[in-house]
Amino acid sequence: MTKIYGEAETKVTALDDVSFSVKKGEFVLIVGRSGSGKSTLLNMIGLLDKPTKGKVSIDGFATSNLTDNEISAFRNKKLGFVFQFANLLADLTVLENVLLPSQIPLDPSIPFANAKKILEKVGLEDQLYKRANKISGGQAQRAAIARGLVNNPTIVLADEPTGNLDSVTAQNIVQLMKKMAKELNQTFIVVTHDRRQFGDVDRIITVKDGHVFEGEHMEQMEVTI
């Protein structure tokens, strides 16, 4: 897959013929220096942007022929997202924030019980009805992880999920994501600038100058680029 921005003299190749696959249940890190292309790569996997050449396949389904509306519905069903900032709506409760992805048009409503179950798993069972502006930064990121999981996605994509946290809270969030990956057999693809923070993971994919290193191909792939 290739991603080019601009044209002629202003052309920049953000990703240059990259290819890798991820198996169900893997915890994968995407690492690289600032500007290396790692966030661009995550955007391609997350169907937030389209490649100039090539395709992204999820669960064996090539997404390149989908319309914009179809991409939106497919993304809401198959993908969960966690970002550096939790971006919870302050006036809503923790539970209401977590339920938001299930209320997106074209996506079936997720049972209330499922959201409560996920919140219990991330350790927020006592915070369900508290306003989002009344919880700590670590709790907010736990709620963001629950929000990413509430639709039972095929993959959770996390972009610098610990980048806005102190070291102790960041380590707690790392352990929580690993716990969710193991308990739910959930695939996580995480962009980070600090691979050491995550310890042992299934695979590390390094992006440098738009190229991918240390990736490998396996059978029974869940994501193919």
Question: Where are the model-predicted features located?
Answer:
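ABC family nucleotide-binding domain
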Residues: M1-D200, I204-V207
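Conserved beta-strand-loop-alpha-helix hinge in the C-terminal portion
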Residues: R203, H211-I225
